[in-house]
Amino acid sequence: RKLPQPEIKSILWNPSEIGFNGKGYRDPATGFSFNTLNRMGDIFIIKSIINTRIEQVQNYLKYSNDDQKPGYQIRYKQSPGSVGDKDKKELSDKDKKIVDYIVKFLEEGGENEKWDCEDNFQEFTRKVLNDSLRLDQMCFEVVRSRDLKLKKFRAVDGALIRQLDTNDPRYAQMFEQFRWHGYLPRYAMVWDGQIIRHPVTGEYVAFYPWELGYGIRNKTTNVFKNGYGCSELETLVEIVTWILWGMQYNGNFFKQGSQPKGFINVKNGNIDQGTLNEFRQDWKQTMSTVYNSHKIPVVQGIDLEWIDLQKNNRDMEFTEWVKFLLVIACAVYRMDPSELGFQFEDAARIFGQEGQKERLDHSKQKGLTPLLVFYQNVINKY
């Protein structure tokens, strides 16, 4: 008698039936929609962080035979027990032709004609990493032949992709009619709460596991995430809000112009309007324009009092507060603020010029290298 194969018993999704929407797919139960995260990604500081990291990745998207230069390589997979170059398998002439084909395939977006409107490797990477750094969801369609050989790939809007209920044992039976090659579809494109139908065929736009490249950087065991990741922007919601409030507060200073340095209080209660108008005109002629800056006015016959509205150092506190928020935003994305061009005097004073270089290298090892490894693993998988 054949013994039953052991299976995993644990669950990955919210066990409550409340999370089941009956539409065939799961939404990320985070409280923030993908559209909200995309709008946050368009805010200047977040966009600067994301674009900077993507531009750094671009340096590694050209094929390189030199281990010391940035770029990617195509080689035989090495066994865990291999040591150094002595166990590295040399490429034959046939292998080199295969490498040339793979490089061309990547850089042209698949087996496309010259004038097909498909992305090259650099453009493709910009799109999928932008989604990953905003939504923590990288998605791209993979087109294969009948024998499942790779033919094309195309970046897909990650905000439209949802995980189907097919890998939830409670609802998998609903999809049995779609089983193919022993697998059920795993992802679908969703718009306005409904799975999209193809405009030509009328079929649901659903993807089997080998038809959609799918990558999550910040995976979690939290069942309330419903199998989705956790975007950095979810962590930064309050920080980004405070940055916007600070910028709005400072912008209103120039927009409304209602923050004078102080007031002149005329103490003479019985002064006539003519004298007051004459004083106002003399003051304007004597003190206005840049040429009269720092002049000392001399006034006779009028008892005046200056009420200063800028006796405190709130401006300095405001600057430090915004600086602190920017540092927090960069820290969540594992990036040093100096990579964005922010040169803080206190940091330069502490670390010096050599220390600054070490900080940049450390920042790239902490943020750029893990992103490259993640991207490499996703590309190799599909």
Predicted regions and their residues:
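Long, compositionally biased
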Residues: 357-382
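Short acidic alpha-helical/loop segments enriched in Asp/Glu that coordinate divalent cations
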Residues: 295-297, 335-348, 377-382
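Active-site lining segments that contact anionic ligands and/or coordinate catalytic metals
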Residues: 332-335, 363
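Structured, contiguous alpha/beta core segments that scaffold functional sites
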Residues: 1-317, 323-324, 328-332
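Short, surface-exposed loop/turn motifs that are enriched in glycine and acidic residues
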Residues: 269, 311-319, 349-361, 365
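Short, catalytically relevant binding-site loops at active-site mouths
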Residues: 303-306, 345-350
